Amino acid sequence: MIELGINIDHVATLRQQRHTAYPDPLAAAVRAEDAGADLITLHLREDRRHIQDADVYAIRPRLRTRMNLECALTPEMLEIACAVKPSDVCLVPEKRAELTTEGGLDVLGQFDAVADAVALLTEAGIRVSLFIDPDAAQIEAAARAQAPVIELHTGAYAEAEGELAERELERIRAAVDVGLLHGLRVNAGHGLHYGNVQAVAAIDGISELNIGHAIVAQAVFDGWEKAIRDMKALMIQARAR
């Protein structure tokens, strides 16, 4: 069964826009689990633009499912991850000027640093995922770095249309095959929404999709729980075909 990770970053974005105490990411996480989320994903960025350190520490002990903490490959973030001990840490690239994560982690270009981080987090009892582009060389490097999980960046597919979207989808399919060949758990995410999720969810071998912005946006109209249930239903329907 394919799993749905609910990214709560943009619940925190709404809060930070006015520097209020609401909406509370912890409440969003708990209610997401009630609605069927299989895990809760949150990105503690270096610039703290949405999720704050206090959120991470407050949410971790309250979850009944899993916490998937996204963070950059920096000493500060690795120290926080080891202190919090989430079930999973997904290492992602970060640029301060970006609106959202723009590309995958360059495992090849910083192999030693990635391998060291994987070893550190694994020693702390944390499963490590690397957020990478659907590229065979990067996947092979992730396997050599001893990461047990990869998350394929689906942004190029999400932004494409027509024939280009189909080509990007084929890249994802091929990347899944490479990941499985290397014994990796393969997840995916970025830019997925109600109109494009099923093509990705239908790919055998993908274990988990992490989705946030689209669900937060739909919740404005339908409510948080319904927005989550509807997304999960689309994923399950696609996988059952």
From Swiss-Prot:
Please name the InterPro entries in this protein's record: Aldolase_TIM, PyrdxlP_synth_PdxJ, Pyridoxine-5'_phos_synth
Entry keywords, A to Z? Cytoplasm, Pyridoxine biosynthesis, Transferase
HAMAP family named in the record? PdxJ
Alphabetized CDD domains for the sequence: PNPsynthase (cd00003)
Chain positions recorded as 3-amino-2-oxopropyl phosphate binding sites: 7, 18, 191, 212-213
Tell where it localizes. Cytoplasm
Q: Which family does it belong to?
A: Belongs to the PNP synthase family.
Q: Upper lineage ranks?
A: Bacteria, Pseudomonadati, Pseudomonadota, Betaproteobacteria, Burkholderiales
Name listed for the protein in its UniProt record: Pyridoxine 5'-phosphate synthase
Its pathway is:
Cofactor biosynthesis; pyridoxine 5'-phosphate biosynthesis; pyridoxine 5'-phosphate from D-erythrose 4-phosphate: step 5/5
Q: What class of enzyme is it?
A: transferase
